[in-house]
Amino acid sequence: MIWRLPLLLVCCAVLSGCTPSGFVARQLIRAPNTFPQVVSPEPRLYFTFPDAVLDTFPLQRATVGAPAVTLAYRILPPADYRTRLTLTNHSGSTGPVPLYLFKGDIPGTPTPFTAHPRGTVVLLHGYGLSQDSMIPWALLLAEAGWRCVLVDLRGHGNSNGDRIHFGLQESADLTALIDELQRREQASWPVSVMGVSYGAAVALRWEMEEPRVRCCVAVSPYGRLGDAIEGLRAGYVSWLPAGIIRRASEKMPSLVGAGPGGLDPMEWMQFRPVGALFVAAGEDEVATPDAVRALHARAAAPSRVIEVPGARHEILPFRVEELRESVTDWLRDHGSAPPP
């Protein structure tokens, strides 16, 4: 399985040519799963997980919300999966790139938490990706006792929706999904959330709006969306004029019904601070360490920020050996209490 950081910016450049920034802005809020996979950069890493995960824990769907959206999700129950990681290299056209091989025993051996989970953790992927990218973390956290819900956010993976809202609508989607999982007796309390990049921004927004979210882990959250988009441009498609992207990012909030800065977690945190474990990558050009620390400075207690030196944006979620203890400790300490 190939992991790639889908660059809608590249698609926009190909599609727009010399078209106005307003067109580019509309493409940037378009559902990523509606774009053809014709243009993509060479992956900066590859990863695999046991194929049996997909068959043993099948994809499910729930139609929720108003207007309705059908969200695809997958549930991994607590069990001992004996998850293990081998790090090697894949030969790319420009040299070796990391290959993360996650292995495990599926369907796993029952543990005391299989019948009585610590709680539910909802895992949210990055922009343009799908729930598959969070399967390694789901295996690890399920081993530690949590029931894990993997979700394709609207416009991603196997979920529908013609546009994305950078957290404004997605938070309501997730609340409606948890309500439906309660009805199906598939959710348990307390509810925690772990998100990566775009998914981290959605996770923070959801924590602000949903009191049933008791704990959050935000991995590489951007502080300001425009800065993150510029980081993608500079890091991946530096030949694309910065002015086009800057003007497009300035127009995006109004296209989803928000005011200036309305898609920026830094602005949200100023007025509705929440606590979280913030995780930064030392060499991140999309969600820079300074941006993550600035979010932490505005966060409510309890909060903590940790940094993985030398890691880049796309690598950080797979540095599980360095992050596993901090993440599980945070969830245990702040997300395992009984609901009020």
Task: Provide a role label for each language-model segment.
Residues 205-258:
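Hydrolase active-site cap/lid region
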Residues 271-272, 278-280, 284:
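Short beta-strand/loop motif that positions the catalytic acidic residue
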Residues 164-185:
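Alpha/beta-hydrolase active-site loop
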Residues 283-287, 314:
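Acidic catalytic loop of the alpha/beta-hydrolase fold
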Residues 18-111:
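An N-terminal hydrophobic leader/cap segment in hydrolases
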Residues 138-160:
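Conserved alpha/beta-hydrolase
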Residues 311-321:
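Catalytic histidine-centered segment of alpha/beta-hydrolase-like enzymes
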Residues 319-340:
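Catalytic active-site module of serine/aspartate enzymes centered on a nucleophile-bearing elbow/loop
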